[in-house]
Structures are given as C-alpha cells and as structure tokens.
Amino acid sequence: VSGTYTEYEIGQEEITDGFGTGMCFTVTRSGENLPSVIQRFFLYEGKDYFLTDVALSDEKGVETNYLRPISTEPDTRCDILGKGDNRVLIVPFDNDKWVRYRSSDLRGGVNSFEVSAVYNADTRRGIVIGSVEHDTWKSGVRIESDEPGIISRLELYTGASGEGTRDVLPHGKVKGKTVRSPKTFFGYFEDWRDGMEEFGRACATIAPPLPWNLGTPFGWNSWAKMEFRLSYEKVLEVSDFFKENLQNNNFENNGIVYIGMDAGWAKMSDEQLADI
C-alpha cells in the first residue's frame, strides 16, 4: 500500500506528558484520492522503549477494522536475541476455556493478545511489544520464526478476532474522519521481565487504577472444589462453615466473607437464589 503514496512529510515536536519529557516524530504519507497515513513515534528521556500509533485520515471519512502500528518487512531475518533458548510469551485475551499464559519455543507461528515478549531464556534479554490503550480495539501480536532463534515476522495489529478472542465474526469497523490505532509499546530490555513491568506502568499511566481506600474483600470461589457440582445445598453448607469457622477467627473483612458461585449456579431456581 505504501507504494501508492507519493508524498511524505516528517515533523517533530517536544512533548511532556505522563511518560516524561521527549520528542514526538510524525511521518505523514499522502496520495491522490487516498486517505493520509499518519504514524507518530514518541521517544522519552531515560526510557528503554518507544510508543507509536498509526492513523488513517480523510475529510470524507474512513473506516477499517485492521491497522498495523508495528510490522516487520516480509523478508525480515532478525537474530537480535542471540544463541540460546529463545522463547515467546503467549498472553491470552481472557481467562475463559481454561486458557493459560505460557511460554513457547520460538519456532513456527504464534499469536498473543494485547502484549507479548520475545526473549532469550538464558540471558533474559528480550523484546516487549504490546498495546497500552484498550478502549476501542482488540489487538494481537503475531510472531513467526522459520529458523531456530530467528524472527521472520513480528507485528502488532488491531482488529484481532477469532477463537482466541471468543469471536465468530470479524472485528467491527471503526469509522470517522480519523481512525487511530492504540498506542503501542516497543522496547528492548536486558531482562524482559523488567520490560513487562515497564509495560504495566505504561498502561497504568494511560489508565490509572481506580482508587480504593477500603478493605480487601475476602471470599471463596466455588470452582476450586466443586467445579460443575455446585448446588443449593452445598452453598448453604459452605455458608454455615464460614459463619462457624471463619468469621469468628478473623478470616473476614469488616465481618463479611463472600461466596463466589461459579459454574452451576444457573441450575438453581429463582427462589433458591433469592434465599441464598
């Protein structure tokens, strides 16, 4: 697509925001009867990462369900991790269907959601890549390797949809005069685990945690023991145990202990649920 664009413009400005002080570089590509492609790069003093986003802009309006703020060229051969046990962190989109975080050999192709890390387990050096804005898009990370230790494809894309996101339809299209991807985090770290901590702080800079000045809720979830065997009678037994053994032994918060009824609660009647 970039080959159809004939004009390029690069701008820069000093910035100061929640991430610190730095520079924003903007690359704008334009062409006749084409929406402008605007990519911004945010670089901050003292940070081992940069942020970037990409946008399509047209006064007549644009719509898309797919953007790639970071993507390698098709013939990429990257061995930045060096020799060793090179691996990929796979992050699930949610916690449904018993899905887990896991580490995979850097071979073939893998998909992660919202964030991933490609790292050398022997040296701990690695790349962390992920979206730090989560209000509009579902994003994915695609990593491929056709040779041990070599990254042949690395991209973060918006519009992730499929079994991993529990979707059966394509991602919805985002419309407007300007459609922008989420800001994307990319950094190389001596220890990829420190990079993941930095990624978390970057997310919290954009969307700070909500304040909570009260106690920590104390409770029990039924799945750990009962799984699908949850029943009205079992819930009452647990409630009695809480009252007789926990609440009077300081296993509580302000005198309250919660019961989280997981899979199986729908088998109870409305009357039983109201009684509980």
Segments from the language model and where they lie:
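Aromatic-lined carbohydrate-binding/catalytic grooves of carbohydrate-active enzymes
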Residues: T216-I276
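Beta-strand-rich recognition/accessory modules
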Residues: S30, G46, I70-T72, S103-T216
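Short alpha-helical segments and helix-capping/turn motifs at coil-helix boundaries
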Residues: S36-Q39, T52-D53, E163-V168, A204-T205, ...
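Residues that flank catalytic or metal-binding motifs in active/ligand-binding sites
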Residues: T21, F50, R180-P182, T216, ...
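Short, charged/polar micro-motifs that form catalytic or ligand-binding hotspots
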Residues: Y44, L210, K225-F228
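Polysaccharide-binding surfaces and accessory modules of carbohydrate-active proteins
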Residues: V1-E147
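Intrinsically disordered, low-complexity acidic/polar segments
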Residues: L34, G61-N65, T76, E190-R193, ...
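Residues within well-ordered beta-strands of beta-sheet-rich folds
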Residues: F42, L51-S57, R180-P182, G219-N221, ...
